[in-house]
Amino acid sequence: TPYEEPCSGHLMDATIRELGVPLVTGDIPGVAVILGAAPTKEEAVELVKSYQAQGILVTLVGGVIDQCLEAGLNMGAAVRIIPLGRDVTSVIHVVSVAIRAALIFGNVTPGDAGNLMKYTFERVPAFVNAFAPLDDVIVACGAGAIALGFPVITNETENIFRVPKSLIVQEDVSKFNATSLEARDIKIKITKIDIPVSFASAFEGEIIRRGDMQVEFDGSRKDCFELVCTKELTEVEDHKFTLIGPDFDQMEVGSKQQIAYIVDVAGKNMQTDFEPVFERKFHSYVNCIEGVMHTGQRDMIRIRVSKNTYEAGFRAKDLAEVLYANIKNEFDAVVDKCAVTIVTDAEECTKLRHELAVPAYDRRDERLTSLTDESVPVYYSCIMCQAFSPSHVCVVTPERLGLCGAVSWLDAKATNELDPEGPCQVITKERVIDENLGRYEDVDEAVAKFSRGALEHVTLYSIMEDPMTSCGCFECICGIEPFSNGVAITNREYTGMTPLGMTFGELASMTGGGVQTPGFMGHGKHFISSKKFMKAEGGVERIVWMPKDLKDQVAERLNKTAKELYDIDNFTDMIGDETVATDPETLLEFLTEKGHPALGLEPMM
């Protein structure tokens, strides 16, 4: 980028795709474009932080960037405050995001201005805050924003032609936030949490460096875990907090410590199947705390608390309050009571990890292993992404999770229980047409209904015949590699070339937008090791190439599947990656040398 730090300039397609899921789920409820310099740096920072606290993605253009820098505000994509550039023309980079969202998620044809503007107006929740004085260039930019459906709010009063709902004069900068949300009809869901620091999805990507760290809880070095336990209603005292061991202020600065938190839940509609669903949310809940970083899950978690957050008064009870408030808020349909126990005593953490947590994880893993597409009575739809891709429908099964990687069959089941009219609806599977393809009359009827007629047929296990649609939020793309008679897979994080002659972004432009593209499909990372992956075409033994990082991530599970299905040991050693080849000819040589099974299979086309 030609822009100087901290300005980012152009935002890559991969960044837009990463924003897709939080925009769909409402974790990012809107996009603010702030132009020019505020009357004072204090007003600039107050406005930016007010949007950040609401989870809104904030993009900055012009003088407001230096005002935020001068005030020492932490900026960057990780905390959802993105300085684009100091010149007003840098606003084109956020306009580009809106346009590409229409192309990526909405399947809008490039050049179709009418449908493009309809899409941005209806589906991209953006607005502009423009500080006085406004020159001709800023006015022109504002007119462009209005044409895309984005209202402009300004404190300029001279020579301004007010347009209701589109060009709004608000002289009081402290009211820009409320005026903007009302103009764009953005509803903010607020979870009131009594803690000494901010809590917002904008902090979810925040990195806490070692030098800024007050204390670290490290599951790779100490006994740590997080666990949800279902109890009877009489066994749980709602909102009870128990601390076993020292609090954060009794721990040495910069030290590695142990921690365990046990969340007891009870409710008439609570099911033990929901426990891992709740636990997976802890990662997001803890990361949303300003100055706290969480990675991992189960008994391999790592949590860092920053010095600033500690000095603001953040202690164990505040961590418990975050877990309690979010569980009660998000899962109120099934949780009537919730109590949190935090353990920091070393002996107790070790004892509870081995006697309580690990056996619970083992029981769940057994349950998940027994969950197959054949063993369950129903599947679920997921249409969360229709906010961006109106014709896309995911069919979620135990062995095929949502293509975003975030919605498993248990997640969809829990979502349906919590919100029976919501995005995850029951799909029966009683009328089988072709078991090998994964085609059912009931599934066809469901996708036709949920796509409002855009789709008529879908198969669950084929890449060639009516494959499932993709929206644009997919973790991976799989495509036919004709030279080797197999398929290559690439993931969003990999920006290099593939043996298909296309990058992830180029493949995604063919695959997304809610359309069916035989020979290509978007999918989640976990689906790669599923016994149902491309079952109709021969399964995982068709995989001939994927980026090395992705291969390393899925190796253990994929090797296990290949061993069970084909009695092949260390199957991933036969799969090419970018260190071996990025062109089909070199890849074929490698596969031949390794004796890859795809070379002996029936042609896919």
Model-derived regions, located:
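Short N-terminal or domain-adjacent regulatory/targeting segments
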Residues: 1-25, 105-113
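Conserved N-terminal structural segment that caps and organizes enzyme catalytic cores in eukaryotes
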Residues: 3-4, 38, 162
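Cysteine-centered metal-binding/redox modules
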Residues: 7, 133-144, 151, 155-605
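A short, charged/proline- and glycine-enriched loop
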Residues: 21-32, 122-125
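Structural motif
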Residues: 33-39, 60-64, 129-134
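Histidine-anchored nucleotide/phosphate-binding helix
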Residues: 37-58, 140-147
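Short internal beta-strands
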Residues: 55-66, 82-83, 152-156
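Acidic/Gly/His-enriched mid-domain segments of enzyme catalytic cores or analogous surface patches
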Residues: 63-126, 139
